[in-house]
Amino acid sequence: RVFEFTNRGDFAHEIFGELVKWADKACPEMILGAGTVVDAGTASLYLQLGANFIVGPNFNPEIAPVCNRRLVPYSPGCGSVTEINNAQAAGCDVTKVFPAGNVGGPSFVKNVMAPLRWSNIMVTGAVEPTEENLTPWIKAGVLCVGMGSKLFPKETVAAGDWAAITAKCQEALGYIAKARA
């Protein structure tokens, strides 16, 4: 299991610190990282709190060495071939195309993969847990996808309907496996 905690709002880092402690006991197999990290200072803070990876909505070359020194993956948001190439040169093994739906969709990823076939691309933004949405992304060559509110609807979370969320996750994983077959 991989889970990205969104760094948004006052005291988000404090919540993350408590989440890391809880996950260590309740879900020791979970890989927990911090997202929406836009500067090196914030990356350092989350690394000290136990983040296993850092994700950003943009590529900030100052974050890469902070993560590289600790051998922690940094996945920056990129919206062009140049940004993806620069992120890879800075040591980022997985780049995030964000916002994927606005950047050009699956055709953008497919076109990037032609000259940069070694790229590991994660897409977020406009990714939905449906077969119609996931299949084109997987066929375009993405390594993985990121989903938030479409996978964890607010009303379902508020109702504590964890069975529905589990079912939606399993369904999405099934679509991904089918697209990769």
Q: Which residues make up each language-model segment?
A:
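Conserved, mostly hydrophobic/aromatic
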Residues: Y46, T95, W137, A172
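Glycine-rich beta-alpha junction loops
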Residues: G125-E131, S149-L151
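Hydrophobic faces of well-ordered beta-strands that scaffold small-molecule active sites
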Residues: R1-F5, M30-T36, I54-V55, Y74-G77, ...
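Short glycine/proline-rich, acidic loop/turn segments that cap or connect secondary-structure elements
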Residues: T135-S149
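Active-site-adjacent beta->alpha loops and helix N-cap segments on the catalytic face
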Residues: F5-D24, A40-S44, I54-Q88, P99-R117, ...
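Long hydrophobic alpha-helical segments typical of transmembrane helices together
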Residues: V145-A181
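Helix C-cap/helix->beta junction micro-motif
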Residues: A26-P28, R70, A179
